[in-house]
Amino acid sequence: GSCFPKDVRAVDQTARAHGYEPRILPAVDAINEAQKEVLFSKIKNRLGDLSGKLIAVWGLAFKPNTDDIREASSLVLIRSLLEAGASVRTHDPEAMGAMSSLLGADAITCVDDPMEVLDGADALAIVTEWKTFRSPDFSRMKKSMKAPLIFDGRNLYDPETVANASIEYHAIGRPPVKPAV
């Protein structure tokens, strides 16, 4: 979201104004910004060329229960996907209007039903941990997607549960999990 980076930068500026050079604060800011690239890197590393791929994205707001997309990691992900030639179809309970306004209505497709977003998708990226995303019908997900492949930026799911549903699962800070045979 917009508060954390703003607050880190404000503390940094205040410290510098008082003659102290806080070396850790610029590092915190840089790490926070770099973390926004992790999900795209995982998708790109797994799928390779993204031209013509359809990536479903669940969650646009920087956190659940808001439509605020300022400094949202979804912005970085979607812009990177579009630049790489992918098509993006999204769902967010609150922030679809804000994202469409920012990126342009033609840049992404916003869909009211989170399961409909998955139709024919080459992968799903989960960016915001909305409650509605916590207990999906994995069987339906697998049937809807062109490739049953989830990139979970919020570690919402138990990897074994996803693997048992025959879906490949990539999360943050965990090894990828291939579908159970």
Can you name each region flagged by the protein language model?
Residues 1-181:
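Structural/interface elements that position substrates and couple domains in central-metabolism enzymes
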